[in-house]
Amino acid sequence: MTLNLYKKLSYALFAALVIFILLTFKQYGISNDEQVQHVYGQLLLKFYSSGFTDQSAFMYKNLYLYGGFFDLIAAFLEKILPLWVWDIRHLLSAAFGFAGMIAVYKSTLELSGERAAFLALLLLAITGAWTGAMFTHTKDVSFGACMAWALYYTIIISRHLPRIPLHLALKLGAAIGFALGLRIGGAFAVIYIIFLVLIAVWLNAGTLKNKLDYCWQSILSLLPAGAIAFCLMAIFWPWAVMGIDHILIAAKSFSHFAFDMNTMVDGEFVSIGDVPRTYLFNYLSIRLPEIFLLGLLSVALMLIIKIKGIKLANSLPEISVAIALLTPLLFVLYDRPALYNGVRHFTFILPALAIAAGIGLSKAFDILMPYKELRLSFIACCILLTSNTIYTLYVLHPYQYLYYNHFAGENFKEAIHDWEGDYWSSSLIDATKLLKNYIDAEQTKLPNKHNQVYSVAVCAEAFQGSAYLDKRFNITEDWVTADFYMSSTNMNCDKVLKGKVIGTVERLNAPLAIVKDRRDLTGEDRRPHAAPRD
């Protein structure tokens, strides 16, 4: 009866998520990289429609280092759907995010039952770094969803080693192929399955001959997965197979970015190449909701308490999740890659973390079952923490991806000052509305200005402003002569140009973006200055 309740709760949550996506996907601002990514998708479409003769996609900026799975679909949908292209991308990205949540539910269900599956789904659903990001982080969330499905099939396959049914191998290969069709980071999924097979050989096989047979049989069973993964990667990332060293070039670029950029670490400006090894851990500890962290703490304590009673040979599915969690985290600690934008580039580990945390909370309920008062207190704590997170996400809408928990600072304003704020400049969607309203009011009082064109400087990509402004405004690169200035407050870019503040986009008393009127400024006051590092 209880299990059926959790199943109904999960389905109800899925339904609520679908409604949420359909009602809000048009409310999210365009992110910095969306234009170049969409152009890349259009160029890939030209590559195929031209019979492989138009290869401009592989000379466009550095986008050839990435797969175009998402962008190719978006470029195709643009031709057939009667929607604005950016709305198409945001809806498609949200669909990927939703698919990732299905994978988390199914994975946790396979490991620990309906209650844990519901809790894992709920945890991911209230994580702003996933649900808030899934509309605008088109590359990160789509990749994370594919990796979540690769993990799901890895879990299923772990129960069948060394003789893996063909249909499972093909499904695993498809998930990995789609992931590689987005980023070279999909190679992590390949590493996961390799580690799993090696651990299975060590735990289950007897003599050396048996171990070799077990390993060989596993390899043979996985060959179809490798074949379909390679084919899908080649379709969505053709550059990868156009040179024998292309995959290695992409892998190197993944871990060592070659450009000058800063990030925020507890109030300090830090070059992305000099971030501490704990950068990702620091951001996970403040970007995940408190209830999520409680789940991770619970699963860690459970493992410590029951470590001696765990039969590793029977725990390959659980080991699969552990591999998916530990491999990228250990990679960051060892390789110390250039990192920025908080957890963005490692969004793909959030599903595995949600699985572990959901199981942790579920097991904690079981352990506390004999202790009524403790159990009720634990449940009350979980409900309060979850409610607080949901309220915070509601207030932040549509900027849920900026969510920070209470460990990040005394309040949200302090958190987005000391850590990365609106790095995608998505809040410009509301900043442009403030500017248009300001000019509307001015033109009502001064009808002679109706035909005037105003120049606007934007601390973001130009199209993020022009996409929402009408013909009265012209986005300019000449910041000195600009009439108006729009910027998110991330990294103090709003302070680069002076001007009278005529509009502020705020959430939880924290400014996310500003609009400045610069028309009355003269001389040196019109010149840009370096963003202060305070």
What does each of the following model-derived ranges do?
Residues 6-12, 104-126, 145, 162-167, ...:
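Transmembrane-helix signature of polytopic, membrane-embedded enzymes
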Residues 27, 70, 238-241, 247-255, ...:
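Catalytic lumenal/periplasmic loop and adjoining terminal transmembrane helix
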Residues 31-32, 129, 135-142:
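Short acidic/glycine- and proline-prone juxtamembrane loop motifs at membrane-interface regions
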Residues 47-50, 66-68, 72, 79-82, ...:
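Transmembrane-lumen/periplasm boundary regions of multi-pass, lipid-linked membrane glycan transferases
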Residues 68, 72, 80-102, 121, ...:
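Loop-to-helix entry region of an early transmembrane alpha helix in multi-pass inner-membrane enzymes
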Residues 91-111, 149-153, 304-308:
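Transmembrane-helix motifs of polytopic, lipid-linked glycan transferases
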Residues 120-125, 132, 148, 152, ...:
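Short helix- or helix-capping micro-motifs
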Residues 150-169, 203:
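Membrane-interface transmembrane helices that cradle and orient dolichyl/undecaprenyl
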